[in-house]
């Protein structure tokens, strides 16, 4: 006969294992049945969407007027230069600063890599990353704005906040490359129905994975603190979601701005899929069953959605989903 409980079991064991540089495994147990998934899923979402990182947000290149231009004496055109630049992971050295403006000048011939961008204001966590090749008798002069932020911000949202001579960049701030979890059963006092959460977390080096995990827990605690008020005096109003909300803006990002491979983009485009929100509301099987969707294309889409804070199979808030569906239906009817 099972003993009657008057409160849920409190987990007592936690372990942290360093798998490799910038990757850890965290195990915690035992949880009551159902508690593990309840806690693990929002923590994973917070890790992917709310961890603070750094990214270039605007670029100005001497002699260049737009992002589809070429750069005299440089092997890469502007669009390829921007793609390479976005792969470089910066660190602002002054922890009190939210943004820095940088200026660089280089003369060829040389192969320009990320380590050449290190100075008194910024560091680079992947110094071996390739940026450009400068030909003999050529030079490259450019200015760059690097900012601190969370999640993903499309270039359209940045355009109106910078001077007209700068090119706005899609900003991928999140430093968390991977955040997955598994739920395992564990035995407690002859009861096999207790659960263990095992997190696998990897970052790009801008932040240590254990720090990202602690910050996600802190964010969750702050968000939950609203329920610590006296509920008898709390307002009964529901959340008012506007069309300008950050969450909705992310879901309405156009797929053609995500820098997907040509094969992957064409697969989605031929299926009439234009917006991130259309992918987010699809199940894993629905995504995989898109015509001509191969494994590489699926993995590329899954990684991109995870960067945006919407892993495949995840959930959209109940108050966001109707507004998203209305906007998509309106756009499709035009």
Swiss-Prot record:
An example molecular function term from Gene Ontology annotations: DNA binding
Of the GO CC terms on this record, one is: cytoplasm
- Catalysis: reaction(s): RNA(n) + a ribonucleoside 5'-triphosphate = RNA(n+1) + diphosphate
Residue numbers spanned by region Alpha C-terminal domain (alpha-CTD)? 247-334
Gene Ontology terms: biological process = DNA-templated transcription
Tell me which EC number(s) this protein carries: 2.7.7.6
Q: Which SMART domains does the entry link to?
A: RPOLD
The region called Alpha N-terminal domain (alpha-NTD) is annotated at 1-231
Q: Name one Pfam family in it.
A: RNA_pol_A_bac
Annotated keywords:
DNA-directed RNA polymerase, Nucleotidyltransferase, Transcription, Transferase
General function of this protein: DNA-dependent RNA polymerase catalyzes the transcription of DNA into RNA using the four ribonucleoside triphosphates as substrates.
State whether it acts alone or in a complex, and with which partners, per the record: Homodimer. The RNAP catalytic core consists of 2 alpha, 1 beta/beta' and 1 omega subunit. When a sigma factor is associated with the core the holoenzyme is formed, which can initiate transcription.
Q: Family per UniProt?
A: Belongs to the RNA polymerase alpha chain family.
Domain notes from UniProt: The N-terminal domain is essential for RNAP assembly and basal transcription, whereas the C-terminal domain is involved in interaction with transcriptional regulators and with upstream promoter elements.
What is the protein's given name?
DNA-directed RNA polymerase subunit alpha
Origin organism of this chain? Answer: Helicobacter hepaticus (strain ATCC 51449 / 3B1)
Native organism taxonomy = Bacteria, Pseudomonadati, Campylobacterota, Epsilonproteobacteria, Campylobacterales
Q: What gene is this protein a product of?
A: rpoA
